[in-house]
């Protein structure tokens, strides 16, 4: 079965069995009897330059898809195969993202076991999220290398991620726990930095936004369900079982993606086709465009592309800088709430550890409701516009949905902060979190799609830089969250003024999508990176 053949399992079977993938040479019009003979001299060849491969000025034979309907092109895979890959990416993202928040219910028990203060223990959350920031700088560019692809990055990094949970669970000091948490964040990051690219590999542009929503739900579900599952482990066993559970869930994901996740990278699939043709014909001139481009990069240029370009884009491009700061603030609020929720619901409402884990479900409910609305918006507004204009319309129109979403964030913060008091039922502040879920979901969807449309040639660097700054902002937030809420009060609404500070900052950010909508085209016209 072709699907299993393209998975890691299939490649391992092929490698250890000594098998070689066969190529339909007649279909590609390849001359196999003499590696030095020009293709045009093969009398029985059915080669068609315009349909398949072309010879460039250097005599290299550029390997491409066999027409628009080539069955090996991931965009032409059957629907069931695309749905399986989508599920794999979403489940992988869910499992890895859960690794951050699953830690929080055990903070108190870890503090008592290791005889340290609260802030040093919170570093276990901070360093994990900081790993999200560093990892994409390494793994995102590597996944674009045609010789590597995405599949191997997912599997190998997840194996390391799973192994890191063992010393984390067995560790008896922060000297062991903290480095392991940071490394786990680094090796868990490919799902977050490359998952969207995997979906873009298989879905047509007018369908891609729908399935990005499911991936986003996986990214939301992980940190939302993490505290609940972590709390269950702390109550039933101990804090160490948070990491054993994370290891078991991740191991299940590893089994699934090993057997049921084929490679989706167009560059890597074409590279393998070119490699098979080289082996079959003995002609070294079969190359892909991506293979040629990557071979022209020196190690220094590749390192610059990995480490320097993402930072340059985030700092020098006003569009990228402003949206990165905005997204970073919205992302930080989630991790601030990992401290605010226990303060409010334990101090005011006297919730148990398990009940504290349940309060995050409001965010998940809000996200699911927003997805339903967003699907209608896509179907009625964006997709018809995309089809009517053949994909060519001002990228700034993608930001329209972010206009109301920008107001939802401060509404949520003021609501949550000042309804969290003993005289108000506990469900009321949880309802307030629904506005955050809705606002953050719509902001993330619109802003990431806009960045991809505005910087198509450098989208990997833009997203890597965004992940670096966004995750760094979020990583720092738990360190000052408890002090901010405890020191501002007041006693009858313990997260009131802290939430107000965040709400005011969110209000200051509201004009950003409006300004980019108005001036974005002019800013892009002055940029050497944007289109």
Swiss-Prot record:
Keyword Transmembrane helix belongs to the record: yes
InterPro entries (UniProt xref): MFS, MFS_dom, MFS_trans_sf
Record: glycosylation sites: 486
Molecular functions per Gene Ontology: fluconazole transmembrane transporter activity
Principal subcellular localization: endoplasmic reticulum
Any one GO cellular component localisation term in the record: plasma membrane
Pfam family, one: MFS_1
Keywords: Endoplasmic reticulum, Glycoprotein, Membrane, Transmembrane, Transmembrane helix, Transport
Keyword Lipid metabolism applies: no
PANTHER family assigned: FLUCONAZOLE RESISTANCE PROTEIN 1, MAJOR FACILITATOR SUPERFAMILY
Protein name as annotated: Transporter mfs1
Organism this protein belongs to: Schizosaccharomyces pombe (strain 972 / ATCC 24843) (Fission yeast)
Organism phylogeny: Eukaryota, Fungi, Dikarya, Ascomycota, Taphrinomycotina
Gene: mfs1
């Amino acid at each position: 079965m072709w699907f299993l053949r393209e998975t890691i399992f299939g490649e391992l079977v092929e490698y250890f069995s000594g098998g070689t993938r066969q190529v339909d040479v007649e279909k590609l019009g390849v001359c196999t009897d003499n590696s030095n003979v020009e293709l045009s001299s093969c009398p029985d060849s059915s080669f068609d330059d315009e349909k398949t491969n072309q010879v460039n000025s250097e005599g290299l034979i550029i390997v491409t898809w066999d027409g628009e309907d080539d069955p090996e092109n991931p965009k032409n895979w059957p629907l069931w195969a695309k749905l399986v890959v989508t599920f794999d990416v979403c489940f992988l993202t869910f499992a890895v993202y859960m690794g951050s928040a699953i830690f929080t219910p055990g903070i108190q028990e870890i503090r008592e076991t290791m005889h340290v203060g609260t802030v040093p223990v919170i570093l276990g959350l901070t360093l994990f999220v900081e790993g999200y920031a560093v990892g994409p700088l390494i793994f995102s560019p590597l996944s674009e290398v045609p010789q590597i692809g995405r599949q191997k990055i997912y599997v190998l990094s997840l194996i390391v991620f799973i192994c890191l949970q063992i010393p984390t669970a067995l560790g008896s000091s922060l000297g062991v726990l903290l480095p392991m948490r940071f490394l786990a964040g680094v090796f868990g990051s490919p799902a977050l930095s490359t998952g969207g690219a995997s979906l873009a590999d298989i879905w047509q542009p007018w369908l891609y936004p729908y399935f990005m929503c499911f991936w986003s739900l996986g990214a939301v579900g992980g940190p939302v369900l993490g505290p609940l599952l972590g709390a269950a482990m702390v109550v039933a066993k101990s804090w160490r079982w948070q990491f054993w559970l994370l290891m078991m869930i991740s191991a299940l994901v590893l089994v699934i993606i090993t057997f049921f996740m084929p490679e989706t990278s167009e560059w890597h699939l074409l590279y393998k086709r070119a490699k098979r043709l080289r082996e079959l014909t003995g002609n070294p001139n079969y190359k892909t465009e991506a293979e040629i481009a990557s071979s022209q990069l020196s190690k220094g240029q590749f390192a610059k592309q990995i480490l320097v370009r993402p930072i340059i884009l985030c700092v020098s491009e006003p569009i990228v800088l402003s949206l990165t700061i905005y997204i970073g603030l919205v992302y930080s609020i989630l991790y601030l709430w990992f401290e605010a929720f226990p303060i409010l619901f334990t101090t005011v409402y006297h919730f148990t550890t398990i009940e504290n884990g349940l309060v995050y479900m409001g965010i998940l409910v809000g996200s699911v409701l927003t997805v339903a609305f967003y699907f209608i918006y896509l179907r009625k507004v964006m997709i018809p516009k995309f089809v009517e204009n053949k994909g060519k319309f001002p990228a700034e129109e993608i930001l329209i949905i972010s206009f109301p979403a920008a107001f939802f964030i401060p509404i949520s913060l003021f609501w949550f902060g000042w309804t969290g008091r003993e005289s108000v039922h506990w469900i009321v502040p949880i309802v307030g979190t629904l506005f955050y879920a809705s606002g953050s979901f719509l902001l993330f969807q619109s802003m990431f799609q806009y960045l991809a449309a505005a910087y198509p040639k450098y989208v990997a660097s833009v997203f890597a830089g965004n992940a670096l700054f966004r995750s760094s902002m979020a990583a720092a937030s738990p360190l000052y969250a408890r002090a901010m809420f405890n020191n501002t009060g007041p006693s009858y609404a313990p997260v009131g003024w802290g939430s107000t500070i965040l709400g005011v900052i969110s209000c200051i950010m509201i004009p950003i999508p409006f300004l980019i909508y108005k001036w974005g085209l002019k800013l892009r016209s002055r940029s050497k990176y944007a289109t």
